[in-house]
Amino acid sequence: MEISGSVLRQLSYVSGYGTPTRSRGVASRVGLRMGTGSGFCDEGHLQYYQDTKKILTPKKLKLLKGFSKLGLASDPEKLAMFHDLQQNLTSDAGEVLLRELEAARAKEKEMKKKRKQEIKAKLKASKMNCESSSSSSSESSDSDGDCDQVVDMNCFRAGAGVVVPAPVEESPLPKTPIVEDTNAKAHRDAMALCSKNDISVSSVRDCIKSESAVVTAAPQKRIEVCMGTKCKRSGAAALMQEFERVVGVEGGAVVSCKCMGKCKTAPNVKVQNSVDHSLARGLDDSVNIPANPLCIGVGLGDVDAIVARFLGESHTDIGMIGAATAT
């Protein structure tokens, strides 16, 4: 038993001793092979440089297209550089043309920026100029068409008078005969109906008189203050309060209205002093008062003058007329 144990110990020692010697010999052989060999074991590192060349070639071709747009035909030196670059993409001419291309692109960007700034400035100016005109076109009232004469308050203060348009000949309409014929026909029809149905004639006459009284109404004089965008900014609210103080607020004598389309000379006021043109004369036929004038550029100091000139001494009765019409 002791002999067999010692033999096994010797065999294991011999086997363990041989293993490191074998591995040491392999490592030495590998080291000798790597030390004596010249170059890399494979050519995979060259793929990086080949890929770089493939990427640079399309970029240079793209630059060539950009160079063709620079107008090189007019400059013989640049044209020669361009042909040289087409034949040899790695030549120094490419750097010169590249700088030319970058300068041209920077110049083009600057021109585009200037054009955008000019367009923006024009749009801003047109927006400021047309702010009032756009609102007036959408909010123009029907009373603007009834205005026959425009009064510039600057000329009015200087004593120049009223801007009178060219007279238009109008054929007189037979208003009264038509009304009389209609009333007479209605009266005859009512009498015939009474005779058939045995109705008293006095009751029918009372009905006809009451209907005619309801239709007839006196024209109301009033002052319309424009409340457009520019007129509001120019103090139309304060102007309306001043007119209410001078004229009175009973019966709606001073009212606000939509834009009249004259906002360039704001604030504006329209005086409705008559419905018929024949009523636009004073007590003296030699003094003509404009019918429904539109006063432009009105200030707070012009309120008394407008009331005295276009409404006359009867402006204190405007509220009474409006109240009678409302009832």
Swiss-Prot record:
Enzyme nomenclature, EC number: 2.3.1.20
Q: Give positions of region: Disordered.
A: 108-146
On the tree of life, the source organism's domain of life is: Eukaryota
The EC class name is transferase
Provide the reaction this enzyme catalyses. an acyl-CoA + a 1,2-diacyl-sn-glycerol = a triacyl-sn-glycerol + CoA
> According to its UniProt record, where is this protein located?
Cytoplasm
Instruction: Give the Basic residues compositional bias ranges.
Output: 112-125
Q: Which GO terms describe its cellular component?
A: cytoplasm
Low complexity composition bias: which ranges?
131-140
Quote the pathway field.
Glycerolipid metabolism; triacylglycerol biosynthesis
Arranged from A to Z, the UniProt key words for this protein are: Cytoplasm, Iron, Iron-sulfur, Metal-binding, Transferase
| GO biological processes | lipid metabolic process; triglyceride biosynthetic process
The signal peptide, as residue positions, is: none
**What cofactor does this chain's UniProt record say it requires?**
[2Fe-2S] cluster
Name the tissues where it is expressed. Answer: Expressed at low levels in stems, leaves, flowers, pods and seeds, and barely in roots.
MF term (GO), any: metal ion binding
- Where is this protein primarily located? cytoplasm
Function of this protein? Answer: Involved in triacylglycerol (TAG) biosynthesis. Catalyzes the acylation of the sn-3 hydroxy group of sn-1,2-diacylglycerol using acyl-CoA.
Q: Which family does it belong to?
A: Belongs to the diacylglycerol acyltransferase family.
The protein in question is named Diacylglycerol O-acyltransferase 3-1
Organism of derivation: Glycine max (Soybean)
The coding gene here is: DGAT3-1
